[in-house]
Amino acid sequence: MEEVQRRQHPHPRRSLKKLSEDSLTKQPEEVFDVLEKLGEGSYGSVFKAIHKESGQVVAIKQVPVESDLQEIIKEISIMQQCDSPHVVKYYGSYFKNTDLWIVMEYCGAGSVSDLIRIRNKTLTEDEIATILQSTLKGLEYLHFMRKIHRDIKAGNILLNNEGHAKLADFGVAGQLTDTMAKRNTVIGTPFWMAPEVIQEIGYNCVADIWSLGISAIEMAEGKPPYADIHPMRAIFMIPTNPPPTFRKPELWTDEFTDFVKQCLVKNPEQRAAATQLLQHPFIKNAKPVSILRDLITDMMEIKLKRQEEQQRDLDQDDEENSEEDDMDSGTMVRASAEDTGTMRAASTLSDGARTMIEHDSSTLDSQMGTMVINSGEDEEDGTMKRKEETIQQSKPSFLEYFEQKEKENQANSHSNRNAQALQNSSDNWKVPQDGDFESLKSWSVEELQRRLASLDPTMEQEIEEIRQRYQAKRQPILDAIDAKKRWQQNF
């Protein structure tokens, strides 16, 4: 395995600190060899590449310029200002056709989320403590620089081949200034969002600490709290419910449980800061990053095995196709005496005599399938895959749901009218509060089903109100940005 890693990542001739002015004036293909697509990040696709001059492996995010350029520039600006071993480094950027190429540090082991998913195993307390220690150091640095990440989760904590964790994906990160000390916009990933972020009451750096606590549970259990329910429902539950904890608390030590508890304090003023949490016994006693190397090696071996299996399947398919080509030499088909047609049904021909074939509907799917599109579940196994190229916009990921539901509402106005009727019929009943469900016992099954059906229209109405409130706050900012751009052009 070490030999494979050396072969895939030869030692660079010199360490790349920053791209030279000369390099930045060239076309990116002259400076880098792009090797393969790694996946999707905020606003664009991420590729693995080699810097030709130094031989160093880098990551390149390619972002279509029709994406929210303001957010992209913000991400670059934040990365440019950061110089920490616990934050992904930024080397430079290019414009190429309609894309912006952002050149960043390559983390060969991928994200902590990848580590869990590919191995199909959650992490131990020791492994979690080691990862969280590096993550907290990254957060301490960011918060000292008066920056909020705003999207901390296992998928945005990257690991290099040595096991060092680094914060990445600053697509929604924000700068704190003296004149704007608090944010009041809902940005981030719903399951990891702090209550004060959802409630739009203003927040600061400790919003990242709540997300870190949720990420700790994610590493331990494989998914964050509320992951099994709809994100929209989670948004309403997070601010009102008690802080989440482990599904099976008895599996975890008191130190780990207390660490998570200190992260998940609902009142942000009472929540611990990164510097304080670095002194927590769970973090202070963390083991060195060397304990993560076996996990990383295990993951890479699994990926390599999948690639080899896939290559064998491809080779086997090529051999079968080659044999069929050798056998398929018939161009003239002898018809039976009663058959005078020139176009024949596929079922009447032998395998080796297909010149002009009329397929019926039953044979079309089975005999004419040439390009197979893998399902999204087989991410690691396909060589030719259809990848969704949708770009994440500069809004909370869950707000895409609002837009989708709005389209569905327009297309299904009739069903909406029925839903409204249900909503009207339910106006005279009260939702049980604080777990008091005694009143439900007196209702009939039909009544319970009717009232359950009325909940969704109510939720959609509340969601629409949130969307409109968000848009009302967002539009003046966009107008101000446009005004500043026009002013700069005039001067």
From Swiss-Prot:
Residue spans of biased composition, Basic residues class: 7-17
UniProt keyword annotation of Lyase present: no
InterPro entries recorded: Kinase-like_dom_sf (IPR011009), Mst1_2_SARAH_domain (IPR024205), Prot_kinase_dom (IPR000719), Protein_kinase_ATP_BS (IPR017441), SARAH_dom (IPR011524), STE20/SPS1-PAK (IPR050629)
Binding locations of ATP: 38-46, 61
Keywords carried by this UniProt record: Apoptosis, ATP-binding, Coiled coil, Cytoplasm, Kinase, Magnesium, Metal-binding, Nucleotide-binding, Nucleus, Phosphoprotein, Serine/threonine-protein kinase, Transferase
Modified sites of kind Phosphothreonine: 185
Predominant localisation class: cytoplasm
Family: Belongs to the protein kinase superfamily. STE Ser/Thr protein kinase family. STE20 subfamily.
The protein's assembly and partners: Homodimer; mediated via the coiled-coil region.
Full protein name: Serine/threonine-protein kinase 3/4
The organism of origin for this protein: Squalus acanthias
Gene: STK4
